[in-house]
């Protein structure tokens, strides 16, 4: 059986201390190490096929390189569920590129927290669910598409009301906004704050939604929801707010407004990384302008 290469083997071959190898392999920038030494250690580590264990990394950096991802899927909101999953995939892809693992945290009344988590990204949780999460997790929590309004937490959310205002250019002044309910009550209220009550159509049953949109001009939030309803309304009487990068395409005859999902994902991760490094920003409210 081939002997496993250790940090001591790399240090011996490179002619440096074990601590120096550890600093270099864990990208420690607070230690003064010459570029020549850094390159030499990395080359030898590569030649020996040395990979530090997760436990060793944790001891060296004080981190476990594990990020929790918390959201709740609702069987009554299939289009919104797809948006959540697509946005989560965007985050996971970027976090993995940074050598960070992601653990899904199912939000339930029997929430069990993995103590190896360094930080959490929570997406569209109700006030009750977020309170349960934050009361049990004492790590940085970044809330996305939620209005928490608590200086302990950062909140990042899409400025959907701006897109609703833009829709007047295409649909005129009298149109209904069709959307599935969001989990976060305050964010849903923020989205619909400037819409007359009779023009808000929150989907409950499909048949009821179809009956409400017939003969009306509508702005639909979510591409999947738009595709489900498209058979019951002409393309000229509808516009769509896209909430994902990975949605199925709509025909060119349908007017589509785009949220800047990539910017939201990048900002979420940047703020999380700063929080993990204890670089806390003064600004805790980040509204993402659309494309």
Region locations from a protein language model:
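N-terminal helix-turn-helix DNA-binding module of bacterial transcription factors
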Residues: 1-62
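Periplasmic-binding protein-like
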Residues: 117-123, 175-181, 214-224, 239-243
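An alpha-beta-alpha
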Residues: 165-200, 280-291
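Short beta-strand segments enriched in small/hydrophobic residues
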Residues: 22, 59-76, 174-180
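Alpha-helical recognition/docking segments in bacterial nutrient-uptake
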Residues: 72-165
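Hydrophobic alpha-helical segments within soluble ligand-binding/sensing domains
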Residues: 152-178, 257-280
């Amino acid at each position: 059986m081939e002997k496993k290469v250790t940090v001591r083997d790399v240090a011996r071959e490179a002619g440096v201390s074990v601590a120096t190898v550890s600093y270099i392999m864990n990208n420690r920038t607070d230690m003064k190490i010459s570029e020549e030494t850094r390159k030499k250690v990395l080359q030898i580590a590569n030649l020996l096929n040395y990979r530090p264990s997760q436990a060793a990394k944790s001891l060296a950096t004080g981190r476990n390189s594990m990020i929790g991802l918390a959201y709740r899927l609702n069987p009554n909101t299939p289009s919104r569920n797809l948006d959540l999953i697509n946005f989560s995939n965007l985050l996971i892809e970027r976090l993995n590129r940074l050598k960070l693992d992601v653990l899904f945290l199912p939000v339930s009344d029997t929430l069990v927290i993995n103590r190896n988590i360094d930080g959490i990204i929570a997406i569209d949780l109700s006030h009750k669910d977020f309170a349960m999460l934050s009361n049990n997790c004492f790590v940085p929590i970044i809330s996305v598409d939620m209005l928490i309004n608590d200086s302990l937490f950062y909140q990042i959310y899409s400025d959907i009301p701006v897109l609703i205002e833009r829709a007047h250019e295409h649909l005129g002044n009298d149109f209904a906004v069709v959307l599935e309910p969001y989990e976060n009550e305050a964010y849903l209220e923020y989205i619909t704050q400037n819409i007359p009550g009779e023009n808000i159509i929150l989907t409950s049953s499909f048949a009821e939604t179809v009956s409400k949109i017939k003969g009306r001009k509508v702005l639909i939030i979510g591409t999947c929801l738009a595709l489900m309803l498209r058979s019951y309304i002409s393309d000229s009487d509808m516009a769509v707010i896209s909430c994902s990068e990975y949605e199925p395409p709509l025909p060119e005859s349908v007017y589509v407004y785009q949220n800047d999902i990539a910017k939201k994902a990048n900002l979420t991760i940047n703020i999380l990384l700063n929080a993990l490094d204890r670089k806390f920003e003064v600004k805790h409210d980040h509204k993402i302008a659309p494309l």
